[in-house]
Design a protein with these regions (language model features):
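A short acidic, Gly/Pro-enriched loop at the edge of an enzyme's catalytic core
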Residues: 40-43, 103-117
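Core SAM-dependent methyltransferase catalytic element
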Residues: 178-199
Length: 199
């Protein structure tokens, strides 16, 4: 049974990555950043757990412009190298890659003055969710916002195994425990929920 769940999860992630790379996106970063979060030019953004494709980081770097900064943070150094190459190819010199372990509070070495912090499809890959929310809170400046996007509890075979997914109610509780206040909930896609918080 465990093997079957693992295989389903792997197949789902492969399908997900293929969709994202071919443009048939499950998530639309531009819509989320411009229409839901409404990130303005010149903002500072931290994408915690950016991943190899770095959809949030790359989209944010285009929006915030030369006067803004985007920190693409991840624990895998090869991922960061890939993201940096994509940014340079796109001429996005305001994007900076940062190695970190998000499950250790204080490990992310960037200024604690982030306007918009993102935890996007990252929680399901981790164990210490509380530490991740504490780190997000530490980095976000007073009045700044946190965006959480995660897989819905039951969204079919696409994505990670069900037992790895973090329910919306749990994410909401964890964020509020560290001091964030909920601004709004939204449908990030048919397969993802979204939560927007303010510090």
């Amino acid at each position: 049974m465990a093997c079957q769940k693992f295989i389903v999860g792997v197949i789902g992630l492969i399908w997900y990555n293929r969709c994202m790379m071919t443009g048939n996106k499950l998530l639309n970063p531009d819509h989320i950043l411009k229409e839901i979060v409404e990130i303005p030019y010149g903002s500072t953004v931290a994408d915690l757990g950016c991943g190899a494709m770095a959809f949030v980081s790359l989209a944010a770097a285009k929006i915030v412009g030369d006067q803004g900064t985007v920190y693409a943070c991840d624990i895998l150094k090869d991922v960061l190298s890939s993201v940096e190459a994509k940014a340079r190819q796109a001429g996005l010199y305001n994007l900076k890659t940062v190695w970190t372990n998000l499950e250790i509070v204080g490990a992310t070495k960037i200024p604690q003055e982030v306007d918009y912090t993102f935890l996007s499809t990252t929680l399901f890959q981790a164990k210490n969710h509380q530490a991740m929310f504490k780190e997000a809170y530490r980095l976000t400046k007073p009045g700044g916002q946190l965006m959480v996007i995660e897989w819905k509890a039951s969204s079919g075979p696409i994505g990670p195994a069900q037992e790895l997914r973090v329910a919306k109610e749990k994410a909401l509780s964890l964020a509020q425990q560290v001091g964030f206040s909920l601004v709004k909930e939204f449908e990030a896609s048919d397969s993802h929920y979204g939560l927007l918080f303010k510090k």
